[in-house]
């Protein structure tokens, strides 16, 4: 969202009240009329089926993940247009900027990361700051810059040599070093897949190659520590549920995609992703994953995992975060073997770390109310501005607005140039 250094006293509160009132009315209307949750433009049978699903719920239980009965995969917040949904958040940020005298204070929430991790930072820069004795908690990765003055073949040869030295073997996950929302993320299972990926990757930019961790469980753990506090805490734990279908032993994969209310909404995307296998009949009870991405835009959904936060998990994440220089706010995206192991602070691998731009994933739980969603978001940004103000007082200088917008423009332009996600 566009950002400004100026806030008009009193205006944010009045506008916030107006927007909140409108959203509250929409929430009450949707609560009274369950059928209205279906996306506009769908046929009547589909609308009725989705309404029944919302009322009844269906249980999701993937390997390693806690079981969860869901009524829909889309939260009320997720149904709002982004411009409308984030307007109250922007107004809240303007109020915080007025109070703390600086709109770009989040850019110094993590002083050793470019822009505090708010825009345009290197993904690898986070992982590199985790000390060597804690690297066992990190998925092995390397960063490679595709030289603009080298041929595709020479870039591929150099990257393969780097992979060999790092001990990384296929399958691997390829992703841009600068990016967001899963753009450009693909599974590369063979050297041929890697060659095709690099052919479509912009030269002069950096790519990350990471060992593929074949665990179904994935979570986003948002961590917060004030600069003057000796210990941090887990602000949010949200589970990612990847788009998938469960075989019944009779239906083809294509039919399962078309009839499952959780996948039919993005059936065209899912069918394209598994095109060679659409006619296959998965055995009864077999889970077929439809995307590598744990992103809402790929059909994934998130649900609240706050009840699974334990002192042991908090201590482990705090140990890692405190060893990262001047790291105060960010989300650890992890794959885990089982929820029991995660609760013990064991059996997980860090795939990515996100900085100041990270959101609490549990706010996108389909059962989350708009009131609670905004409460969490407002609290999150309050902490972010407080941390930024404290670090500014310690001598760290926030980025200028023009420089921030330049980073925003660069990242947005890169997203359009990356290979298609897988």
Q: Where do the PLM segments sit?
A:
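Hydrophobic/anchoring residues in structured secondary elements
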Residues: 143-144, 334, 355
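A long amphipathic alpha-helix within ATP-dependent nucleotide-binding catalytic cores
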Residues: 256-344, 391-419
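C-terminal active-site "lid" helix and adjoining low-complexity regulatory extension at the edge
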Residues: 3, 13, 28-35, 42-44, ...
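Short secondary-structure junctions and interdomain/linker hinges
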Residues: 98-101, 137, 205, 244, ...
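Coil-to-beta-strand transition motifs
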Residues: 216-218, 227-234, 326-329, 342-348, ...
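Short hydrophobic beta-strand that contains or immediately precedes a catalytic carboxylate
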Residues: 173-174, 331, 350-352
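ATP-binding N-terminal substructure of ATP-dependent carboxylate-amine bond-forming enzymes
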Residues: 1-136, 144-157
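Active-site nucleotide/adenylate-binding loops and adjacent lid/helix of ATP-dependent enzymes
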Residues: 112, 122-274, 310-314
């Amino acid at each position: 969202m566009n950002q400004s250094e100026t806030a008009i006293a009193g205006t944010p509160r009045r506008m916030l009240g107006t927007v909140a009132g409108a959203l509250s009315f929409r929430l009450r209307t949707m609560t009274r009329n369950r059928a209205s949750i279906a996306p506009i433009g769908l046929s009547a049978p589909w609308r009725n089926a989705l309404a029944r699903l919302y009322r009844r719920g269906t249980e999701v239980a993937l390997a390693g993940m806690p079981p969860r009965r869901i009524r829909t995969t889309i939260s009320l917040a997720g149904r709002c247009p982004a411009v409308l949904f984030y307007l109250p958040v922007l107004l809240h940020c303007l109020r915080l900027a007025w109070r703390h005298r600086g709109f770009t204070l989040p850019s110094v929430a993590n002083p050793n990361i470019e822009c505090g991790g708010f825009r345009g930072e290197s993904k690898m820069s986070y992982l590199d700051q985790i000390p060597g004795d804690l690297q066992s908690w990190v998925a092995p990765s390397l960063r490679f810059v595709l030289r603009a003055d080298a041929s595709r073949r020479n870039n591929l040869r150099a990257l393969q040599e780097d992979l060999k030295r790092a001990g990384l073997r296929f399958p691997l996950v390829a992703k841009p070093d600068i990016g967001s929302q899963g753009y450009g993320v693909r599974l590369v299972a063979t050297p041929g897949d890697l060659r095709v990926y690099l052919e479509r990757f912009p030269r002069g930019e950096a790519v990350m190659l990471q060992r593929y961790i074949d665990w179904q469980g994935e979570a986003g753990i948002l961590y917060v520590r004030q600069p003057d506090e000796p210990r941090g805490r887990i602000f949010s734990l949200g589970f990612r549920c990847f788009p998938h279908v469960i075989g019944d032993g009779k239906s083809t994969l294509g039919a399962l995609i078309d009839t499952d209310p959780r996948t039919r909404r993005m059936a065209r995307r899912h069918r394209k992703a598994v095109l060679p296998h659409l006619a296959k009949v998965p055995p009864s009870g077999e889970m077929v994953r439809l995307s590598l991405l744990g992103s809402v835009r790929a059909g994934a959904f998130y649900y609240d995992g706050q009840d699974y936060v334990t002192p042991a998990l908090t201590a482990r994440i705090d140990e890692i975060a405190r060893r990262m220089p001047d790291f105060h706010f960010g989300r650890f995206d992890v794959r885990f073997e089982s929820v029991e192991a995660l609760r013990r602070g064991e059996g997980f691998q860090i795939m990515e770390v996100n900085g100041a731009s990270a959101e609490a994933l549990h706010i996108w739980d389909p059962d989350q109310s708009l009131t609670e969603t905004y409460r969490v978001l407002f609290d999150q940004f309050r902490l972010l501005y407080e941390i930024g103000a404290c670090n500014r007082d310690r001598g760290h200088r926030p980025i200028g607005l023009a420089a921030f917008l330049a980073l925003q423009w660069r990242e947005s332009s890169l997203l359009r140039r990356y290979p298609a996600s897988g």
